């Protein structure tokens, strides 16, 4: 196959992480189950928030958008993955691969930025409660979300355009679940120094800056909570941000396992970590946010038409 990766006929072979038919069947049913659970969980969160005026607050506004992002995120990768598990033809066109990569980068970035905005929301609610209504006005919430979307779209476009300049040659076999940046760069036969430098530099800004902001927010939140004299009030206050803290830990923990390493050390063992951030995290987010949320339990009960009992 020649090195002209701009050809409309260019293709990759998306081989997945196993070529065993038996293992592929197991993986098919596993990922199908996880996909259905993810879709159901995030759709229920969106329906619950949109159907009850008591949940029309900044925190739930951002949570609904996080659920929408997670829903879009898994739909970008898993359906193609399921088709490949059941098909002998593993080919994915170059254009389709780049499209998948674009949405993957954009949606991961959007997830990251929304989590940072949610941390700011919790900071204002706990550290500056008297100013919460004015500080988190509907106009500001829409503006913050628009900035998140804009930065995510531009960042995904930047990396995708840079990837479009990379030349591939030899066997274009992707032993992975989807078209992922590091995996594609390992297949390149042209110099990838520039794109790798841009990837590291922009990645540090796009991901570490929000992480630093969230860390600073939680330092102030913890300090404020420690000043509360009542133990029960401390617990109640902390519980309002515990779910967000759990999601942030899961999101950044799995991303760090995959991306905080040199390109030349990237290997198939990182597939497990990739599955964690690409599939497990979007699946777990609705459960984490609704597990101990009494308001969410009541609304979900009405949406489902039956009582929604919190697990003992």
Curated annotation (Swiss-Prot):
Q: Name one GO cellular component term.
A: plasma membrane
Query: Using the chain's own numbering, where are the disulfide bonds?
Result: 97-189
Keyword Cell membrane attributed: yes
Cross-referenced CDD domains, in alphabetical order?
A: 7tmA_OR1_7-like
Q: Give TM segment ranges.
A: 26-49, 58-79, 101-120, 141-158, 197-220, 238-260, 272-291
The residues on the Extracellular side of the membrane are: 1-25, 80-100, 159-196, 261-271
The glycosylation sites annotated in the UniProt record are 5
Cytoplasmic side of membrane: 50-57, 121-140, 221-237, 292-312
UniProt signal peptide: none
The record's section on InterPro entries has: GPCR_Rhodpsn, GPCR_Rhodpsn_7TM, Olfact_rcpt
Report which superkingdom the organism of origin falls in. Eukaryota
A GO MF annotation of the entry reads: olfactory receptor activity
Q: Which GO terms describe its biological process?
A: signal transduction
Location of the protein in the cell: Cell membrane
The alphabetized UniProt keywords are: Cell membrane, Disulfide bond, G-protein coupled receptor, Glycoprotein, Membrane, Olfaction, Receptor, Sensory transduction, Transducer, Transmembrane, Transmembrane helix
Q: How does it sit in the membrane?
A: Multi-pass membrane protein
Known PANTHER family for this protein?
OLFACTORY RECEPTOR
Q: Which family does it belong to?
A: Belongs to the G-protein coupled receptor 1 family.
Protein purpose: Odorant receptor.
Protein name as catalogued: Olfactory receptor 1D5
**Naturally occurring in which organism (per UniProt):** Gorilla gorilla gorilla
Q: Which gene encodes it?
A: OR1D5
